[in-house]
Regions:
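N-terminal nucleotide/polyanion-binding subdomain common to many enzyme families
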Residues: 1-92
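A short helix->loop->beta-strand "cap" motif at the edges of active sites that frequently abuts
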Residues: 33, 102-104, 185-189
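A transmembrane-helix-recognition feature enriched in membrane-embedded lipid enzymes
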Residues: 69-76, 206-259
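Short gly/pro/ser/thr-enriched loop/turn and capping motifs at secondary-structure boundaries
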Residues: 70-72, 172, 196-201
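Conserved beta-alpha
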Residues: 77-159
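Short Gly/Thr/Asp-enriched flexible loops that form oxyanion-binding sites at enzyme active sites
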Residues: 120, 174-183
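Short, flexible loop segments at boundaries between secondary-structure elements
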Residues: 138-143, 186-224
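Proline-aspartate-enriched helix->loop->beta-strand connector
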Residues: 156-165, 169-170
Length: 259
């Protein structure tokens, strides 16, 4: 398949963001550079209130549907979304797609102490060589400390990585990438992928395939981590249906659109 031209790519407008209407295979074949963000319901709610997060989305080269629920609701639009591409499973697809590419060098940034290193070990064992060239678990609140952020930039640069996965939660990971991307010229692909490092390390289990297939992975995760996720899924994310209903009725207004 020929590389897709950005100006020829189809986009689906959901609330105030444009989502690339792309399949997993198309993304694998065309993700050569840029920032990848993966909107889900939680992101879409934050994007109604957080201008900095919204600006990051506008500057990101790849905006891909992460949510099965968003994918299903997208069927109500004139041009439905082709495929939901959960970031956690996409990353596995990405390194397996590039497993024979000696030029693909990945750095993992995120998760709790020791987990990123464990993920690095497992991935390298799976692909049979040192594809992941570095891993680091930053301190809690690291993004508020410029000296630590600059040290992280130095570590990534010295690793020789050209792919950086940041998994410290949204919107922190997306904002951090956009703030520091220009200081890491060797990195061509930036991925903001939440709990992916934990999944790769085996410290967090993905939902069984049947739960994923029917769009209920979010419920499975909530059952596993109710204290952390109940409010997000059953209170905060419910706002999406209000906003999406307004879009279907043609009365939704982008809170950040210039007058």
């Amino acid at each position: 398949m020929k590389e897709m031209e950005n100006n020829a790519m189809e986009f689906i407008k959901v609330l105030n963001i444009d989502i690339q209407n792309i399949t997993r295979q198309e993304l694998l074949e065309n993700l050569k550079e840029g920032v990848l963000v993966t909107p889900n319901l939680d992101h879409l709610i934050k994007l109604q209130k957080d201008k900095e997060f919204y600006d990051v989305y506008q500057k990101s080269e790849w905006v891909v549907c992460d949510s099965k629920i968003l994918y299903l609701f997208g069927k109500l639009l004139k041009n439905p979304i082709k495929e939901a591409i959960p970031g956690s499973s996409f990353f596995t697809s990405y390194y397996m797609y590039h497993k024979d590419d000696a030029d693909c060098k990945i750095f993992l940034l995120g998760a709790k102490e020791g987990i990123a290193a464990k993920a690095m070990e497992r991935i390298n064992e799976k692909v049979g060589h040192q594809m992941v060239v570095g891993a680091h678990s930053p301190s809690f609140g690291f993004e508020k400390h410029e000296d630590e952020c600059e040290e992280l930039v130095r570590i990534v640069n010295e690793s020789g990585a050209n792919v950086l996965l940041v998994g410290v939660g949204a919107p922190k990971q997306e904002k951090w990438i956009m703030k520091y991307r220009d200081k890491m010229p060797g990195v061509k692909v930036f991925m903001a992928l939440g709990a992916t490092i934990d999944f790769e390390a085996g410290t967090l289990k993905r939902a069984p395939k049947i739960w994923q297939k029917i769009g209920m992975e979010w419920l499975y995760r909530c059952m596993k981590e109710p204290k952390r996720l109940f409010k997000r899924y059953f209170v905060d994310d419910m706002q999406f249906f209000y906003y999406f209903g307004k879009q279907l009725l043609g009365i939704y207004k982008d809170p950040f659109r210039k007058k």
